Amino acid sequence: MTSQLHKKGEAWSARFSEPMSELVKRYTSSVFFDKRLALVDIAGSLAHANMLAAQKIINADDLAAIERGMAQIKGEIERGEFEWQLDLEDVHLNIEARLTALIGDAGKRLHTGRSRNDQVATDIRLWLRGEIDRIGGLLNDLRGALIDLAEQNADTIMPGFTHLQVAQPVTFGHHLLAYVEMFTRDAERMRDCRTRVNRLPLGAAALAGTSYPIDRHAVAKTLGFDGICANSLDAVSDRDFAIEFTAASALVMTHVSRFSEELVLWMSPRVGFIDIADRFCTGSSIMPQKKNPDVPELARGKTGRVNGHLMALLTLMKGQPLAYNKDNQEDKEPLFDTVDTVADTLRIFAEMVAGITVKPDAMRAAALQGFSTATDLADYLVKRGLPFRDAHEAVAHAVKICDDRGIDLADLTLDEMKQELPNVAHLIGDDVFGYLTLEGSVASRNHPGGTSPDQVRAAVKAARAALAK
């Protein structure tokens, strides 16, 4: 009997009395994006074929033919010679058709005991597992670049902000290490997500399992999975692992976006804390002086793109009854684009961070504005017995006086300070000015998690050790 796969183009066409509409073919075909799964599809098929042979479901000659044919197909794909056909719907049927053309009936036996439902679920998990590992490495590269820059700036003082208002002095190294913490958690989330990705769906078949005496654990071991999906319906129908990865990716991009916002602000001429290397910037077609931080700006925009993919996948799954539905074909493009966006962003950011020029004088000048050591003066009074709320009120009064005069707290003489703060004058001595310096302020935060240079250097050492694990 002539194979329906080669007679009409569809693997299922014998059931139907008329050919599929060309419009429907174009609408339902996924081959021109899911061909990205081709190499993992081949890997999954080879593991499946070896299991079928071991279980005496196919013979050794069939297995040898399948392995020979798949080797040729893999080479054609890698060389860009494989001819993808819209009529064959997807990556799976394109490869199967080519295999059958090369080796004959043995190619038709490969699909014994499986469905495209468990096949594609396996492909996605195999592919995503590798991409998670790649993204983990890129996160480590970015963490390493930030750690290096933090170490170089353990003593560089800048203003810390709340509400974008000057709050307290911090070291630039401490500020950068905050992002190291964020990206470290991102890496942990990726590793955690991988444990749920790394389960084998193959063997679930269409939805109920198969009547053949398959060995799912052998296939899982061959493909490097930690175990098998325990329920066949769940194995083929849920994409929560893809949603979880995309959610973790959205957090990666959220942290990138926050960092990007600061880079843009820091590079602006009115702030001037840093300069980004020319190779990461662009100019203007009309304004000759412009140097635009397009990379961080675009990263902010791409964060919305990944957030959109997360919402798309959540919406995709929310209304589906068990088991597999064609809706799930729509999981791949958001997933593929999320991987590409995150990977490209992390790669370029690691390189860009390594090329940042820091301007310590501008940072220091900004930290001297906005009464950034006011809290230190309050703490000084508290350490001399004044309740904190009373100290807070007294210093707020002093700030108002200095603001009206256009000077900083440190610009007051000792006599002026006592005169303006008569209620606490007896607590103020010559040593107060040491508390009002930027260096004294940051040095006093000398505890784990604090901004002092010594703590920054200790945190750098710990971060490097964590990165090496």
From Swiss-Prot:
**InterPro entries this protein is in?**
Arg_succ_lyase_C, Argininosuccinate_lyase, Fumarase/histidase_N, Fumarate_lyase_CS, Fumarate_lyase_fam, Fumarate_lyase_N, L-Aspartase-like
Encoding gene (name): argH
tRNA processing in keyword set: no
Protein name as annotated? Argininosuccinate lyase
Q: Where in the cell is it found?
A: Cytoplasm
In its UniProt entry, the species of origin is given as Burkholderia cenocepacia (strain HI2424)
Keyword terms, alphabetized:
Amino-acid biosynthesis, Arginine biosynthesis, Cytoplasm, Lyase
Q: What class of enzyme is it?
A: lyase
**A GO cellular-component term linked to this record:** cytosol
Q: Which CDD domains match?
A: Argininosuccinate_lyase
